[in-house]
Design a protein with these regions (language model features):
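Small-residue-rich segments of transmembrane alpha-helices in multi-pass membrane proteins
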Residues: 38-48, 106-118
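Phosphate-handling active-site elements
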Residues: 56-60, 99-100, 122-124
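Alpha-helical transmembrane segments and their membrane-interface boundaries
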Residues: 1-68, 72-74
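Short, non-helical or kinked segments that cap or interrupt transmembrane helices
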Residues: 26-39, 72-81, 95-110
Length: 126
């Protein structure tokens, strides 16, 4: 992957986080622009790094299928999804039959997923 492509992926993630965060901040909701940008950016950086590591592993060992070495593509990204879910759980509050923060948790989780999608280079999907 060229440096400019990694930069484009990261920039796209920042713009996605900005759009989601701006909408949340405009409505005076918790977890605004900075939080959504950071979640989206962090997820995109992990995706770019994972893509780089996968390319390096496959370049070093082109006979990866014949040697029995198992390369698990997507393992790091899966941990990002569960980690952001854990972060979102911290934004949910319940008191006296009222639950608050579900939309904030969902928006953080979606921002992280969209950051992963942008970081993987699926521009049209993001």
């Amino acid at each position: 992957m060229a440096w400019w492509e990694a930069g484009a992926r990261i920039l796209l993630a920042i713009l996605i986080g900005l759009a989601i965060g701006y909408e949340r901040e405009r409505r005076n909701k918790p977890a605004g622009t900075r939080t959504h940008i950071l979640v989206c950016l962090g997820a995109a950086l992990i995706a770019v790094m994972e893509n780089y590591v996968e390319a390096r592993v496959l370049a070093i060992n082109t006979d990866v299928l014949n040697t029995g070495v198992a390369v698990s593509m997507g393992r790091i990204s899966a941990q990002v999804v569960s980690g952001i879910g854990f972060l979102g759980a911290g934004t949910i509050f319940s008191s006296r039959k009222k639950i608050a923060g579900l939309t904030t948790a969902a928006s953080l989780w979606c921002a992280g997923c969209l950051g992963l999608v942008a970081g993987m280079g699926c521009y049209t999907l993001a």
